[in-house]
Curated annotation (Swiss-Prot):
Name the record gives this protein: 3-hexulose-6-phosphate synthase
UniProt-listed SUPFAM superfamilies: Ribulose-phoshate binding barrel
Family recorded in the similarity comment: Belongs to the HPS/KGPDC family. HPS subfamily.
EC number: 4.1.2.43
Function: Catalyzes the condensation of ribulose 5-phosphate with formaldehyde to form 3-hexulose 6-phosphate.
Cleaved signal peptide residues: none
Organism: Staphylococcus aureus (strain MSSA476)
NCBIfam families the UniProt entry points to: RuMP_HxlA
Catalytic activity, reaction form: D-ribulose 5-phosphate + formaldehyde = D-arabino-hex-3-ulose 6-phosphate
Pathway given in the UniProt record: One-carbon metabolism; formaldehyde assimilation via RuMP pathway; D-fructose 6-phosphate from D-ribulose 5-phosphate and formaldehyde: step 1/2
Pfam families named in the record: OMPdecase
Keyword Lyase: yes
Amino acid sequence: MELQLAIDLLNKEDAAELANKVKDYVDIVEIGTPIIYNEGLPAVKHMADNISNVKVLADMKIMDAADYEVSQAIKFGADVITILGVAEDASIKAAIEEAHKNNKQLLVDMIAVQDLEKRAKELDEMGADYIAVHTGYDLQAEGQSPLESLRTVKSVIKNSKVAVAGGIKPDTIKEIVAESPDLVIVGGGIANADDPVEAAKQCRAAIEGK
């Protein structure tokens, strides 16, 4: 089981500084969509240039022109790139092909997908590296959690890894870990903690069953 830190609300310098503080406890560091909107792909490059021994994910949330956008993210140092599960099949296939051609990985974000079971099966057959169930900020505010979605997707896929995101914190991560996802994505639960290093350490301990 892997742990990913999602960083959404910092500038690229502070993001790299935070990532380096917790890198002993995480496998993947994400440059979140808001940072990419604010600072562009150079934010991904800054992270890639300033951290070692962890993968860098660019949360592009691609919808179209997929092979080009994947190639650009890779050029700027991304190891994992995200595309939306609601994108066209042709876009997702092109994104997977471009990522794999460069020995990189593609994560498909299932945010706003209505028929999770059907879409997860299709994405699994297409060769997505990760399929991520994601309760976004707006639904978290309504009290929703990704647990049920995680169970649904995990029950139908054969080859892809299952990732889970959405309001996960050190004090709630154990119920997520109990469902055995392949990748647990924690954002504010680490980034906004009073002590991010301690929060990351607790999350790592949870996924290692300690």
